[in-house]
UniProtKB/Swiss-Prot annotation:
Enzyme class: transferase
Post-translational modification comment from the UniProt entry: Auto-ubiquitinated; which leads to proteasomal degradation.
Gene3D superfamilies per UniProt: 2.30.30.1190, Pneumovirus matrix protein 2 (M2), zinc-binding domain, Zinc finger, CCCH-type, Zinc/RING finger domain, C3HC4 (zinc finger)
Keyword tags: Metal-binding, Repeat, Transferase, Ubl conjugation, Ubl conjugation pathway, Zinc, Zinc-finger
Name by which UniProt lists this protein: E3 ubiquitin-protein ligase makorin-1
Ranges where the record places region Makorin-type Cys-His: 236-263
Keyword Plastid: no
Annotated organism of origin: Mus musculus
Catalyzed reactions per annotation: S-ubiquitinyl-[E2 ubiquitin-conjugating enzyme]-L-cysteine + [acceptor protein]-L-lysine = [E2 ubiquitin-conjugating enzyme]-L-cysteine + N(6)-ubiquitinyl-[acceptor protein]-L-lysine
């Protein structure tokens, strides 16, 4: 009996479940169901059935508008951009430098004038009215959603289901405050582009802005075009930018002058590169500009001849110890003595250009801290004639004075003091030709002694600095050292 009753019980239970399911189905038929698209689907959220959709087919797919809808023909939303009142304009095209060109997925069009924008808004009204008529079919569902939102957030105002702009609801944009359907009307946070009363008072008037050049048009293209409140200048023939003020003659002449100066510098650089690129070093026989190591692509310009050498080779030649000074200071080809070598990125031949290069080299050296002076902690053998900067940690410059104290021995300190005394005596009391040989001998002895003093002081002498100092002594005292 128990075994026979069990199937009956089961049948009774299943019949009750079927009746409940029928009642639930009948109640659901009165509420039209709308399948919301999945926000994380990356497309229109459609399934395999491409024929369905209903009212959604009249709504343009937002993913298709951005060119990233992965549903394709199966998307339940419309892929017809002609139904969309607004197109997605490429922001890079508006700035004037879209690299995709005609292959860009976004719209390449000029900004609309105010009249065209007004006409577009008027033509968009019928489509909004048609979309609002569709909202009656989903009214109950919208009311349910808004009721649930109101119960969760009682302070938020409820947005009616029959709003005309529900299709064009504000989307989330990174960097801007989000305004959803159940969120406040964003009055607390001013949207991007809005200004407060105080800011509007500080802004210049229309008359003032019309006198100022548009900064966007000056560097490329202004997205506002003819509707820009600022003045679009005339194009410069030199740089091609809209930077010439139509009325201000002083501004026009100043800009043209600066453009001409920049053009002349560019031409000088072009000529320098042209005469430099094929120069071959006379020692290693390599094209200097084609060396494998970029740091070796520099010339060593000799002060008294025009033979070509790379900086590495000529410095190696002049640092040889097995020859006397007269040999290593002379050019390897013509044997003309040059007191120093000027490093240069470009090849220079003219004497005036060499003088400019030497002056620039000295100025560059004067901006570098002297390693011998060491911010007042050391002692520089060149004293006030040093080409490097003698400055203390607080920025104060060293006052010119005689160097009386050495670093390694009392004898060298006395000889250095005597050296500077001879210089002061030469400046105050010019001597005759009979005493010139004695002074020449003294100066030569002092220079040789100072050059040989680096080992005891654990300092490495700068060849360029000694060469420049030697040349300055010869020019100042008219001596041949």
């Amino acid at each position: 009996m128990a075994e026979a009753a069990a199937p009956g019980t089961t049948a009774t239970t299943s019949g009750a479940g079927a009746a409940a399911a029928a009642v639930a189905a009948a109640s659901l038929t009165s509420i039209p169901t709308v399948a919301a698209p999945s926000p994380g689907a990356g497309g229109g959220g459609g399934g395999s059935d491409g024929s369905g959709g209903g009212w959604t087919k009249q709504v343009t797919c937002r993913y298709f508008m951005h060119g990233v809808c992965k549903e394709g023909d199966n998307c339940r939303y419309s892929h017809d951009l002609s139904d969309s009142p607004y197109g997605v304009v490429c922001k890079y095209f508006q700035r004037g430098y879209c690299v995709y060109g005609d292959r860009c997925r976004y719209e390449h069009s000029k900004p609309l004038k105010q009249e065209e924008v007004t006409a577009t808004d008027l033509s968009a009204k019928p489509s909004l009215a048609a979309s609002s008529s569709l909202s009656s079919g989903v009214g109950s569902l919208a009311e349910m959603n808004s009721g649930e939102a109101e119960s969760r957030n009682p302070s938020f105002p409820t947005v009616g289901a029959g709003s005309e702009d529900w299709v064009n609801a504000i989307e989330f944009v990174p960097g801007q405050p989000y305004c959803g359907r159940t969120a406040p009307s964003c009055t607390e946070v001013p949207p991007q582009g809005s200004v407060t009363k105080e800011e509007s008072e500080k802004e210049p008037t229309t008359v003032e802005t019309k006198k100022q050049l548009c900064p966007y048009a000056a560097v490329g293209e202004c997205r506002y075009g003819e509707n820009c409140v600022y003045l679009h200048g005339d194009s410069c023939d030199m740089c091609g930018l809209q930077v010439l003020h139509p009325v201000d003659a002083a501004q026009r002449s100043q800009h043209i002058k600066s453009c001409i100066e920049a053009h002349e510098k560019d031409m000088e650089l072009s000529f320098a590169v042209q005469r430099t690129k094929d120069m071959v070093c006379g020692i290693c026989m390599e094209v200097v500009y084609e060396k494998a190591n970029p740091s070796e692509r520099r010339f060593g310009i000799l002060s008294n001849c025009n033979h070509t050498y790379c900086l590495k080779c000529i410095r190696k030649w002049r640092s040889a110890k097995q020859f006397e000074s007269k040999i290593i200071k002379s050019c390897p080809e013509c044997r003309i003595t040059s007191n120093f070598v000027i490093p240069s990125e470009y090849w220079v031949e003219e004497k005036e250009e060499k003088q400019k290069l030497i002056q620039k080299y000295k100025e560059a050296m004067s901006n570098k801290a002297c390693r011998y002076f060491d911010e007042g902690r050391g002692s520089c053998p060149f004293g006030g004639n040093c080409f490097y900067k003698h400055a203390y940690p607080d920025g104060r410059r060293e006052e010119p004075q005689r160097q009386k104290v050495g670093t390694s021995s009392r004898y060298r300190a006395q000889r250095r003091s005597h050296f500077w005394e001879l210089i002061e005596e030469r400046e105050n009391n010019p001597f005759d030709n009979d005493e010139e040989e004695v002074v020449t001998f003294e100066l030569g002895e002092m220079l040789l002694m100072l050059l040989a003093a680096g080992g005891d002081d654990e300092l490495t002498d700068s060849e360029d600095e000694w060469d420049l100092f030697h040349d300055e002594l010869e020019d100042f005292y008219d001596l041949d050292l």
